[in-house]
Design a protein with these regions (language model features):
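Buried hydrophobic packing segments
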Residues: 76-83, 114, 191-198
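Active-site SXXK
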Residues: 66-89, 102, 273
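A short glycine/serine-rich beta->alpha loop
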Residues: 60-68, 99, 180
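Active-site-adjacent helix/loop patches that line small-molecule binding or acyl-intermediate pockets
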Residues: 3, 7-37, 94-189, 197
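Solvent-exposed loop/turn segments at secondary-structure junctions
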Residues: 46-48, 67, 109-110, 120-121, ...
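Short, conserved catalytic-motif segment at the N-terminal edge
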Residues: 32-65, 81, 85
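Short, well-structured active-site flanking segments
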Residues: 82-101, 111, 205-207
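Structured C-terminal helix/loop/strand segments within mature extracytoplasmic catalytic/sensor domains
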Residues: 2-23, 32-37, 183, 192-307
Length: 307
């Protein structure tokens, strides 16, 4: 188990000790669970603000690269926001609907459409020669943009692939590379930094692409019961009181179960929590993430943030 601090938050020793205990407790309920499979970034904020270094937090295995599944859609949403601000893309009803469906409903079809717009590439059969080289160059535009942001915590991440129900095929499969070496890859700190940007560093105007609004979750039990893909049940949101305000984006496939969440507790303390669970056994488990969130929330009810 490796603990790290990153530049966008201040390290809290108290939270670090608490997280160690929380993760140990959560893993103790299943003999097959190991802290080495889990990556966590946890940050507390006094209030919403636009200043870096405001949050206090901690992390475990938070530099470890894993397949992010649908967590990567946070990156694509932020890219769309910046493309629009730069005038590269025009804001339209269709674009708004695509980003909403990608973030709120986790639609892979919407994600595919958006990546086509962001990169000027399309899926299809394999191509060769100059066409193929140009295609790969274009598809890497999002990674180039991430690099140009010069955020230390984004170093080494790979966000250039579409998300699939039953793919990839053709040029998309070839772009994955030998042994899937070019699959998307993120760590919990990079996901946390992207979510922090969406939640507190963007000053949304009336006609902006409101990414934050697309991540808002409904915790009403009746609503959740009628939506089997609600990104709450089996994820962090399930472990939180139903009365809180929650924004989140989950990621789930046969190999992983992840979640990234932002909420406010009764003391107006803002919490950002990203948990990556890597392995088929976690993908099938629906109790681990809610337990982590419950323990973090209860700690925060007693927690006094440093000045």
């Amino acid at each position: 188990m490796i603990l790290h601090t990153m530049s966008f938050y201040n390290l809290s020793k108290e939270m670090g000790l608490a997280l160690n205990d929380i993760l140990g407790k959560a893993c103790s309920y299943n003999k097959d669970f190991s802290s080495e499979d889990i990556a966590i970034t946890w940050i507390n904020y006094k209030s919403e603000n636009k200043r870096v270094f405001k949050g206090f937090g901690t992390g475990i295995n938070n530099k470890k690269m894993v397949y992010p599944a649908s967590i990567v859609k946070l990156v694509y949403g932020l890219a769309a926001y910046h493309w629009i601000k730069k005038g590269i893309l025009l804001l339209s009803d269709e674009l708004i609907e695509a980003v909403w469906k990608m973030l709120s409903l986790s639609s892979n079809n919407a994600t595919s459409f958006l990546i086509d717009l962001l990169t000027g590439t399309t899926s299809g059969p394999c191509i060769e020669g100059e066409l193929w080289e140009n295609w790969k160059y274009q598809r890497s535009i999002i990674n180039d943009w991430l690099h140009d942001l010069r955020w230390e915590e984004l170093s080494g991440i790979n966000c250039c692939q579409k998300t699939w129900d039953d793919g990839p095929f053709g040029r998309e499969k070839e772009f994955y590379g030998y042994d899937n070496k070019n699959r998307n890859a993120m760590n919990s700190d990079s996901a946390a930094r992207i979510l922090e940007e969406i939640m507190i560093h963007i000053d949304y105007q009336k006609n902006d692409l409101n990414l934050r609004g697309f991540l808002k979750r409904n915790l009403n039990k009746v609503f959740l019961k009628n939506d089997s893909l609600n990104q709450i049940d089996g994820f962090l949101g399930e472990g939180l009181p139903k009365s809180i305000n929650l924004w989140s984006k989950a990621g789930l496939m046969s190999e992983v179960r992840h979640d990234s969440a932002w909420w406010t507790n009764s003391q107006s303390l803002h919490t950002l929590l990203v948990v990556f669970c890597n392995g088929e056994k976690y993908s099938k488990d629906t109790s681990f993430l809610p337990l982590i969130a419950k323990e973090v929330y209860e700690f925060n009810e007693r927690y006094t943030i440093e000045d």
